Amino acid sequence: MSNTTPMMQQYLKIKSQYQDCLLFFRLGDFYEMFFEDAKEASRVLEITLTKRDAKKENPIPMCGVPYHSANSYIETLINNGYKVAICEQMEDPKQTKGMVKREVVRVVTPGTVMEQGGMDENQNNYILSFIKQDSNYALSYCDISTGELKATQIEDEDTLINEIVTINPNEIVVNQEIDENLKKQIYLTTETITIRESISDASYEVNQLTNNHMYLATQLLLDYVYHTQKRDLSHLETAITYAAVDFMKMDYYAKRNLELTESIRLKSKKGTLLWLMDETKTPMGARRLKQWIDRPLINKERIEERLSIVESFMNHFIERDTLRGYLNQVYDIERLVGRVSYGNVNARDLIQLKHSISEIPNIKSLLESMNDVASNQFSSLEPLEDLLQVLEDSLIEEPPISIKDGGLFKQGFSKQLDEYLEASKNGKDWLAQLQAKERERTGIKSLKISFNKVFGYFIEITRANLQGFEPSKFGYHRKQTLSNAERFITDELKEKEDIILGAEDKAVDLEYQLFVRLREHIKTYTERLQKQAKIISELDCLQSFAEIAQKYNYVKPEFSDNKTLSLENSRHPVVERVMDYNDYVPNDCKLDKDNFIYLITGPNMSGKSTYMRQVAIISIMAQMGAYVPCNKAELPIFDQIFTRIGAADDLVSGKSTFMVEMLEAQKALTYATEDSLIIFDEIGRGTSTYDGLALAQAMIEYVAQTSHAKTLFSTHYHELTTLDQELPSLKNVHVAADEYQGELIFLHKVKDGAVDDSYGIQVAKLANLPDEVINRAQVILDAFEQSQNTSDNEEHSNITVLKDSASVEGFTDDDAQNANNSDKKSQTTKNAIENEFEQASFNLFDSEAMTSEIEEQIKNLNISNMTPIEALLKLSELQNQLR
């Protein structure tokens, strides 16, 4: 574009360096966008798209936003996945001849937001990088708003994906094109993936990372952060290394299925474990709580250390209540310190910092009065009295937001500033006296002396008072004409204006310099402030644990050395909270080395899934160091939790419900150990009945013979309930239900033994399906059950249990041939049954329903809860009635 103006040439040159960003190009009081940037921004921001050089042959698309309100527009663009490069004027246009120098001072990306309004205060804003070296991965991530920086090494892709999901970054930086399947998995977390082809000469050092892979991953991350932010980030902490195996492992599906931090239906915090447990009082505590939920501990000593502090707060109710009041006055120290270091802190932020650190002595004194494990654990709390005094002496209590307009500092903080302010004040007093004098001299009572930034000070007279008024007679010089007034200046006013404005300008300039000096002084406290923030966040989490334990009647869990899981009257903490507490039915669970598999049967909607979830959630809460919703809890320490709950296609990867089910089952069967917990909810329902039944049985046998992981397995395949005869480690339990006058009543109580009825039609009635459908289903079911009974008399059960001598690996060709012959015989019988069933069902459908008193009695029998003796007695009674 040879005919473009010098300004547009400057724009195009800068834009060529930031092609993946929307360029905010500063022109006066606006940030302007051009070409495709303007089209995109106008659409997303819903602002007017105009044209530059509209009368020329090829006008340039253009839009803009005011610079003073740009943050809200930038926030909207970032939330829509864009990056924004901010290009500022580096010179004062009024004092520059020719083209004003411009350059990009910062690139805002989803992972580098620093503005308070652009972030959820209760969520970290992570940016993450990883590299692949041979078959291993190294990963590093940070939150530049808080200074947190961590790195780890990972052995395989599955663990990498799990770790990325746990961290939940808003942006990912990689050094090469990544595998398409891996990219799809990453898109579960974030769509902002940046590829960096090379690392620039670093102006920083990655300290204390001896592992070369982690060093390179962290260097890649920091190179990108410094490249986009273009400033000192001294608040970034020294990189902390960790190992994923130091925490309980849960993959994306487990966290989703258990609804730990996000609900499945609403995609929100409400209705999750995080929602239940969050009684924190500070943003730092809320963020720490989410981290603890995502990473339960596996170190028994650390778990019990947290539990002992929670117990201390439980025993000191009054002190805990007082502590909550103190914490409520603490602002987000982590992010306040981050803004100090970053350079975008304002005076109101520093007042918040002052109030926050003023509470530390109160908190420390309170903990010391408890004189127990809590006071010892948090003894490193530091009052920071010297910093508090500096803030107390310097800033006024309610300063303006802008740091460039003055009015920030207390009188007495700076002698020079006081002199400027006094000169300005005296000048304003003089102006008030001049206004009174001019009113007297001219006889115009409404005359006033005013000021604006364009014209300075002036005398204003309304048009109604101008009739017969001669300005020259009073030494007035016309300055501006308005529709309803005239504005004048006098030589005396002009002379005083220079003095007043000179003092004001000097005062404003000096206040800005003083504020920058104060900010730099506070930066020297960065490390100490970050340490206090970390302590307060952990303290806040632990008092929150005590608060919910007291409020909802939780107990302190104990950890067994013999790997026993024993829960008495356990409850699902979230379901219990949304229900009336007295309506929730608690249940027991007992798994140990000998009986480590529960096979759970019962009707739909009876509470099987809730029961399994509550066992998993109680285990997570316990390993976080929290009390749990039970009367008594003895638990092992689980290394991993695997879940297969619910039916949902994976639309991202294009996988069916059944494929997702099998993939989740594969992970559990492959990676589970004796120290793992497996939750399988109705495995096999995504395929044909016989395939599903066979797979479900094979999985149960595999767990029983290999990993010995503690397993809760719910099913509607009632044929599986005979497995307890061959697998000593398996125990049948069921969730009880009752029938009363043809209506199904859920008891929600888990009892020993199996049931052979899923009450599907009764559940359908509860869902208000049409009566015609319900009646038709009952007829078909009766016919099918009659045919099935005939079949059962002709052949044995299809359930075949592998003996210990015939392990999964030892399944022979002869076994396969026998199974094939059995399948053929079963298929012949099955075809005959289906023909008989089909004929019977249509005959029954056309007949009228006959009812009688005896039929009603039979219909209302709860066979599942009757003993054999009770059944025989009832049968005899009915037989007598028929005679």
Swiss-Prot record:
GO cellular component: cytosol
Binding site for ATP: 602-609
GO biological process, alphabetically ordered: mismatch repair
Keyword ATP-binding part of the UniProt annotation: yes
SUPFAM superfamilies: DNA repair protein MutS, domain I, DNA repair protein MutS, domain II, DNA repair protein MutS, domain III, P-loop containing nucleoside triphosphate hydrolases
Keywords: ATP-binding, DNA damage, DNA repair, DNA-binding, Nucleotide-binding
GO MF entries: ATP binding; ATP-dependent DNA damage sensor activity; damaged DNA binding; mismatched DNA binding
Similarity comment text for this entry: Belongs to the DNA mismatch repair MutS family.
Function per UniProt: This protein is involved in the repair of mismatches in DNA. It is possible that it carries out the mismatch recognition step. This protein has a weak ATPase activity.
Protein name per the record: DNA mismatch repair protein MutS
